[in-house]
């Protein structure tokens, strides 16, 4: 007899975001389809990336303690397998180039559009 109560684990998304209201918006968009872990700065994000083994990271560029680019570089020193999608309210071409050079998998601008965000996550999680 099969157990109908078993379900697949939802993918775990690490959200590195220092502004609580921005995290709450992402939570509203993502919580039905994903388990979420919140890092409030880059240092926490690096710690959680290797302690909690998320399936993907959604990372703000402008954060205290360690910014998103430095955090991405730290993650990339240890793995290139973890998908990292950078997000910023400052959509400068230099930010995009710097993030790509550091090894990000995608780049989205704030305010985040739910369809665009889910498209990126689906691309790297399926």
Where are these regions (language model features)?
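Two-component/phosphorelay signaling modules centered on CheY-like receiver
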Residues: 19-37
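Acidic, metal-coordinating helix/loop segments flanking the phosphotransfer/catalytic sites
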Residues: 38-56, 77
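Acidic catalytic/metal-coordinating carboxylates
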Residues: 18, 41-44, 67-73
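As written
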Residues: 68, 100-105
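C-terminal output helix
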Residues: 112-121
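Receiver (REC) domain active-site loop signature in two-component systems and cognate sites
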Residues: 63
């Amino acid at each position: 007899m099969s157990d109908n109560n078993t379900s697949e684990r939802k993918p775990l998304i690490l959200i590195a975001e220092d502004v609580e209201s921005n995290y709450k918006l992402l939570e509203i968009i993502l919580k039905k389809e994903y388990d979420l872990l919140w890092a409030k700065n880059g240092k926490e994000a690096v710690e959680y990336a290797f302690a909690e083994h998320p399936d993907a990271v959604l990372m703000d560029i402008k954060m205290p303690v360690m910014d998103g680019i430095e955090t991405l570089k730290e993650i990339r020193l240890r793995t290139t397998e973890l998908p990292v999608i950078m997000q910023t309210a400052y959509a400068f071409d230099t930010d995009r180039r710097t993030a790509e050079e550091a090894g990000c998998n995608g780049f989205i601008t704030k305010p985040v559009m739910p369809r665009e965000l889910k498209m990126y996550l689906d691309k790297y999680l399926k």
